Amino acid sequence: MKLPLLLSVPHAGLRVPPEAEPYCILTPRQIAADGDEGAAGIYALESDVVAYQTTAVARAIVDLNRASDDRGPDGVVKTHTCWNVPVYRSFPPGDVVESLLQLYYWPYQRELSRLAGRGVILGVDCHTMLAQGPPIGPGPGVDRPWVCLSNGEGTCPQPWIESLRNCFQEVFAGPVTINDPFQGGYITRTHAAELPWVQLELSRAPFLDLAAKRLLVLTALTNWCDSIG
């Protein structure tokens, strides 16, 4: 039986869409470093859950976990990566930015809304995080836990996230935190109006390979669903 979960994996993509290609100056390595490296492997759980959504588009080009009007350096269409590397030789004109949103951003958000009504009890926005904070992000240079679960602004019931933390702590030997260093993002805050949501951040530190991390994530999620009944 599939787990009654909706998994969102918004930052696993590596593709620069054609609308942005004439402007983007990032190398493939820089694009990968700005995204959630390892997420495509760790969260390859589509066959295990009721609903699943991901994208091939790189986070550096369209960040699906930002508000559509967030036009800062690390906003929905970025000027710089999380390593403070310029994304574009010259920033795309307004019509190109709007095309990126219409073609890649809004369809993702609409699909999450549609999937929320598909017999799921919890949405999980799945990410990987650097072992230490990058220059642009919470806690630059600070060591991070193995797992961070977030429900900032009450995106899921507190007893749920506490029991979810316990399930992750049972299978991961390293620290599992709630709302530290992350407190959730646009996806969890916005779509919590439709369904309870949590944000899941798994460290990229090499304490396990991707397959082992995937198995532990699946085990923790399965145990949590069993505990909820």
Named regions from a protein language model:
Residues 1-229:
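N-terminal catalytic or cofactor-binding beta/alpha core of small enzyme domains
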